[in-house]
């Protein structure tokens, strides 16, 4: 009989955020990486590439100079303290979390299709409601007209990058238990 245990730091079905920095995973510098652990201590926790880079850069208290000179070959998981060996190729050779990666690709594809169509994809199955909205947009009345959609796309294109800007975390926040607990309780980005 196999016991299934829910590990609190593993991302849930709808969760696309790193549990260390609370920033959303993406297909770039915040790609979801799965820590393999060792034969003795299996890990399997998922963190973003930026947090993994920060963990690898932290020495054993060697200071900033030690961080610049070398990266550690073993990273300790901040959730279960299991050591994970870094591959020879560096952090980018660490295995991606395939489930989260596929969800991020689907999300990016949907956003691309939505941008091409100029209209966000509707997920409701109410055919009458959709027919009314289509009729309204054909008339040109209200915020569903082509002019409003074009303005909305321009607005999103101009202000979209600004929404993703967040101030960087101080380096001492990564292991601060009190701040991490507060962040978990409030689900806020610090």
Curated annotation (Swiss-Prot):
Family matches, as PROSITE patterns: ZF_RING_1, ZF_RING_2
Keyword field contains Transit peptide: no
Record-level Gene Ontology MF annotations: ubiquitin protein ligase activity; zinc ion binding
Compositionally biased tracts (Acidic residues): 126-136
Keyword Lyase appears in the UniProt entry: no
GO biological processes: protein ubiquitination
Highest taxon in the source lineage: Eukaryota
Residue numbers spanned by region Disordered: 111-145
SMART domains found in the cross-reference section: RING
RING-type zinc-finger residues: 18-81
Keywords tagged on the record: Metal-binding, Zinc, Zinc-finger
Protein name per its UniProtKB record: RING finger protein 227
């Amino acid at each position: 009989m196999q016991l299934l245990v829910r590990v609190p730091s593993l991302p849930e079905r709808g969760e696309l955020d790193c549990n260390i920095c609370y920033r959303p995973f993406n297909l770039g510098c915040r790609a979801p990486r799965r820590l393999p652990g060792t034969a003795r201590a299996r890990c399997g926790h998922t963190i973003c590439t930026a947090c993994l880079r920060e963990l690898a850069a932290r020495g054993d208290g060697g200071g900033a100079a030690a961080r610049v000179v070398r990266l550690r070959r073993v990273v300790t998981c901040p959730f279960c303290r299991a050591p994970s060996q870094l591959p020879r190729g560096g952090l980018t050779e660490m295995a991606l979390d395939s489930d989260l990666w596929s969800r991020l690709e689907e999300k990016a594809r949907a956003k691309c299709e939505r941008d091409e169509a100029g209209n966000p994809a509707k997920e409701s199955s109410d055919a009458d409601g959709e027919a009314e909205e289509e009729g309204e947009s054909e008339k040109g009345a209200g915020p569903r007209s082509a002019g409003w959609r074009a303005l909305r796309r321009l607005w999103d294109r101009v202000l979209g990058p600004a929404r993703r800007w967040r101030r960087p975390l101080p380096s001492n926040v990564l292991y601060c238990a009190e701040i991490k607990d507060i962040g978990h309780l409030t689900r806020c980005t610090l």
